[in-house]
């Protein structure tokens, strides 16, 4: 049986997701507390029992929901170099369809002067999480995490840009460089391994 705190936290997560979805559908400026409460199926007072104010709701909902987007994204990431081409071809379109509105809202919030410090903090966390992911990938694909991490950043940036603006040219040029880069790095580090790690 769940404790009261667990129930509270579960309900809060549910509210954050529904509020973020409501903002993503209707825009940040045109959405008031009544619309949020309606989307959550609760009263305005009930929302305020979970969040001190609208700013706290926006900040916490954005961080929570965008971490979930990251998790969705990274679950699809390849663990084998042979799978990279499929990943690079499919994921930008998948994430644009599934997360495009969320990316647009995230940038609207995190570039707002009121919330920019929270945006900086969120992206520091993104850097740490992607670096940790790259470290887990290193033994699986044979490329050092210090090389994988910037490749992840390039890929994610291109996907987010496409999800927001549907700029096919930008996406395809970035993806082509990534595919070639991964192939070159995989060959380089495989040959280093075969030569006892002496090759630079």
Predicted feature locations:
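Helix-turn-helix
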Residues: 14, 18-56, 60
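Short, basic, alpha-helical segments at the C-terminal edge of helix-turn-helix-like DNA-binding modules
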Residues: 62-70
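N-terminal intrinsically disordered/low-complexity leader segments
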Residues: 1-10, 193-200
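Hydrophobic alpha-helical segments that form the core
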Residues: 143-165, 173-184
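Short alpha-helical scaffolding segments that buttress acidic/His motifs in well-ordered protein cores
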Residues: 92, 106-110, 152-159
């Amino acid at each position: 049986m769940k404790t009261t705190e667990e129930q509270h936290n579960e309900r809060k997560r549910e509210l954050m997701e529904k509020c973020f979805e409501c903002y993503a559908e209707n825009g940040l400026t045109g959405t008031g507390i009544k619309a949020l409460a309606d989307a959550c199926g609760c009263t305005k007072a009930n929302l305020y029992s979970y969040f001190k104010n609208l700013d706290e709701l926006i900040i916490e909902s954005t961080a929570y929901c965008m971490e979930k987007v990251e998790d969705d994204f990274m679950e699809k990431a390849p663990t084998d170099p042979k799978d990279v081409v499929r990943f690079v071809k499919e994921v930008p379109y998948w994430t644009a369809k599934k997360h495009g509105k969320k990316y647009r809202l995230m940038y609207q919030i995190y570039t707002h002067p009121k919330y920019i410090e929270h945006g900086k903090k969120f992206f520091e966390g993104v850097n740490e999480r992607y670096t940790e992911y790259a470290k887990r990938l290193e033994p699986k694909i044979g490329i050092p995490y210090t090389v994988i991490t910037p490749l992840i950043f390039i890929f994610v940036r291109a996907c987010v840009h496409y999800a927001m603006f549907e700029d096919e040219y930008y996406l395809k040029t970035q993806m082509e460089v990534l595919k070639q880069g991964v192939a070159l790095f995989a060959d380089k580090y495989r040959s280093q391994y075969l030569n006892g790690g002496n090759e630079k």
